[in-house]
From Swiss-Prot:
InterPro entries: Ribosomal_bL19 (IPR001857), Ribosomal_bL19_CS (IPR018257), Ribosomal_bL19_sf (IPR038657), Translation_prot_SH3-like_sf (IPR008991). Keywords: Mitochondrion, Ribonucleoprotein, Ribosomal protein. GO terms for molecular function: structural constituent of ribosome. One of its GO terms (cellular component) is mitochondrial large ribosomal subunit. It comes from Reclinomonas americana. It is found in: Mitochondrion. This is Large ribosomal subunit protein bL19m. One of its GO terms (biological process) is translation. Pfam families: Ribosomal_L19. Belongs to the bacterial ribosomal protein bL19 family.
Length: 113
């Protein structure tokens, strides 16, 4: 049974649409998504990638941005059918750590995209 689950996850990973993009923590990303109910409405989300978790079968990323005076963190599954497009806009300067959780304690001007 376990072998069957692993093979299904490996097939899902191979079918991934966003495997071509090489996303690293510290990248400034723009993600285009669609809504469940209204398929015509597309939404652009921008933010700094503060963490990547690679699991068997799927990969999640966390985006952080400062919008309207409030810090927001959102997590996305890259293999999700909601995500239409991912673009890498640029990179932030600073540490070369794998996780950029130290940005939570920094000033809002450093988190703003």
């Amino acid at each position: 049974m376990l072998n069957l689950i692993q093979t299904l996850r490996m097939e899902a990973t191979q079918k991934s649409r966003h495997k071509k993009t090489q996303i690293q923590s510290g990248d400034i990303l723009s993600i285009t998504t669609t809504q469940y109910k209204n398929k015509k409405r597309k939404q652009n989300l921008k933010g700094i990638c503060i963490g990547i978790k690679k699991r068997i079968g799927y990969t999640t990323i966390q985006l952080r941005n400062f919008i309207g005076g409030v810090s927001q963190e959102q997590s996305f599954i890259l293999e999700s059918p909601i995500i239409n497009n991912i673009e890498i806009i640029g990179k932030i300067k600073g540490n070369t750590k794998a996780k950029k959780y130290y940005l939570r304690t920094k000033s809002p001007s450093e988190n703003k995209v």
